[in-house]
Curated annotation (Swiss-Prot):
Gene3D superfamilies: 3.30.420.40. The modification Phosphotyrosine is found at Y205. The gene is Nagk. It catalyses: N-acetyl-D-glucosamine + ATP = N-acetyl-D-glucosamine 6-phosphate + ADP + H(+); aldehydo-N-acetyl-D-mannosamine + ATP = aldehydo-N-acetyl-D-mannosamine 6-phosphate + ADP + H(+); N-acetyl-D-muramoyl-L-alanyl-D-isoglutamine + ATP = 6-O-phospho-N-acetyl-D-muramoyl-L-alanyl-D-isoglutamine + ADP + H(+). This is N-acetyl-D-glucosamine kinase.
Length: 343
């Protein structure tokens, strides 16, 4: 019987399993609920993984009792060694027919392995933000990812918070706003459906919902697209903060990553990247300044990319590589380049 290789994209909200043949063809897929073991516990996590793989095996016309050759799991929280060991033990002990071999890695590593063969940077800007560097040898380092209380700079939450803070500080006469606050102030009252600043406090404290608060970023983006100077200023600052995350990991980058035809590959994940044109000026400024300050002449170009396929593909590739099998990947199909720059 033909060998099958599996990959799992484990998200905080949704998860996906892909089954591939040994020549890299996708034979079946299955979707499921969150497999973030920090949120749901290890027991529920492995049950959901087994259930999704079982469903995918049936779709592929395979006996569920025949184990996969390997299963590569790209999970949020996949960098915690103790948690990973516990997950492996649970998978092996409870579901002996699931797979012969397991490889568990981070969501960032699975994403970059879907887009490029050798590694690169994953730069996340959704509700929160994070920057992870994956070198060709698989080693990782990063900047950010500590949540909204400690940072999340350049994220949707950060953009929304900056906008609200600038308005509050300007009205209080604590700090002069860089531009007129009129548009952002009215957008803020409209979005939160309150008549004044006191009404905003409910959304900041008693009824705080991070996703809802971050959603105000969309209104700032609309204002920026309409030409509001303050909205444009905030997005430029967000671009700068995201660029500084890349600058922060430059000293850790294997020089090999600068030498490919793409230059440094940067995989952009999250909805804030839909507003790239608004982020661009600040992003380029931060990279240009950081490159000069660090005298990083080998960093001569970069390419921004977006995934077109699930990071379960990268998970499957890493899982197969772990047991010495190379799964063919068409990286030009898996990810699309949307911006390139040479210094």
């Amino acid at each position: 019987m033909a060998a099958l290789y599996g990959g799992v994209e484990g998200g905080g909200t949704r998860s996906k399993v892909l089954l591939l043949s040994e020549d890299g063809q996708i034979l079946a897929e299955a979707d499921g609920l969150s497999t973030n073991h920090w949120l749901i516990g290890t027991g529920t996590c492995v049950e959901r993984i087994n259930e999704m793989v079982d469903r995918a095996k049936r779709k592929a016309g395979v006996d569920p009792l025949v184990p996969l050759r390997s299963l590569g799991l790209s999970l949020s929280g996949g960098e915690q060694e103790d948690a990973v060991r516990l997950l492996m033990e649970e998978l092996r002990d409870r579901f002996p027919y699931l797979s012969e071999s397991y490889f568990i890695t981070t969501d960032a590593a699975g994403s970059i392995a879907t887009a490029t063969p050798d590694g690169g940077i994953v730069l996340i800007s959704g509700t929160g933000s994070n920057c992870r560097l994956i070198n060709p040898d698989g080693s990782e380092s990063g900047c950010g990812g500590w949540g909204h209380m400690m940072g999340d700079e350049g994220s949707a939450y950060w953009i929304a918070h900056q906008a609200v803070k600038i308005v509050f500080d300007s009205i209080d006469n604590l700090e002069a706003a860089p531009h007129d606050i009129g548009h952002v102030k009215q957008a803020m009252f409209n979005y939160f459906q309150v008549p004044d600043r006191l009404g905003i406090l409910t959304h900041l404290y008693r009824d705080f919902d991070k996703s809802k608060f971050a959603g105000f970023c969309q209104k700032i983006a609309e204002g920026a697209q309409q030409g509001d100077p303050l909205s444009r200023f905030i997005f430029r600052k967000a671009g700068e903060m995201l660029g500084r995350h890349v600058v922060a990991v430059l000293p850790e980058i294997d020089p090999v990553l600068f030498q490919g035809e793409l230059g440094l590959p940067i995989l952009c994940v999250g909805s804030v990247w839909k507003s790239w044109e608004l982020l661009k000026e600040g992003f380029l400024l931060a990279l240009t300044q950081g490159r000069e300050q660090q005298a990083q002449n080998s960093f001569s170009s970069f390419t921004l990319m977006k995934l077109r396929h699930s990071s379960a593909l990268g998970g499957a590739s890493l899982g197969a590589r772990h047991i010495g099998h190379h799964l063919p990947m068409d990286y030009s199909v898996n990810a699309i380049a949307f911006y390139s720059y040479t210094f």
